[in-house]
Amino acid sequence: MRVVTFAVLIMSLSAVSVAQDTRPVRQSAPRWPDGTINLGAPPGQTGMWDGGEPLTTIPNNYEKVGGRPRPGLVHLDQIPIQPWARALLDARHARFLADEPYTRCKPSPAARAFQTAYGIELLNLPGTGRIYLFQTGGAHSFRVIYMDGRSHPRDVQPTNFGHSIGWWDGDTLVIDTAGFNEGFWMDRDGLPHTSQLHTIERFTRTDFSSIRYELTVDDPGAYTSAFGGQMNLRWEAGTELFEYQCQQMNYANELMVGQFEKVDRSSFIIP
């Protein structure tokens, strides 16, 4: 009887072992020959990063968080926002975010770049002194991050993407950006900012399929102190950025082809 019991136990453990062996192996982050983390697809492969997560959660908005918020998600009440900026934020939500620049095909930096349905690509090539971040769409938006040790210019011309310099902190890419204009929203929920905005972004490819994105916002024109949050980017293997019709002031494709006479803003979906 003991022999039978022991045999059954061995078979059971073997079955568990086989089941465990068939589980997908977690791949480590790819690296270039010099040891630098590759933030994109390995040579000969394709893929892009998909975000979509909110950086903040705002009471009574279209992205309610059920249950316990994930780590890194910042509640609006925890953001040290100035009264005028909070009033502007409330006004944007009263208009159902209808004035958001990104939905009018304007480029957007910081967290907003990762809160779309279309993905982004990160390209870092050792020896070039540059890292590029590409966004999909007809606007052909991309950022250049200078990795050659330079500083920000004293009189930088304000732009949507600002002026970005970067460096490696171990396996984490750190990007310091200043010189923003006020023509964009830095996240999908409409957080205001001023030309004093200064951001620090940290990209950590924790494994082949994941990047932890951390953002620190410092804008004394709109907030009483610096604050930050984080989100996760997911790797979509075998995919590439694609073209779609997107021009400034193009409110709807239907208007261009004459099927409708007005824009329907009743949908909760924000591109």
Language model features: what each stretch is:
Residues S14-V16:
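N-terminal signal peptide c-region/cleavage motif recognized by signal peptidases
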Residues M1-V4:
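Positively charged n-region of N-terminal signal peptides that target proteins for export
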Residues V18-P271:
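PEST-like low-complexity, intrinsically disordered acidic/proline/serine-rich tracts
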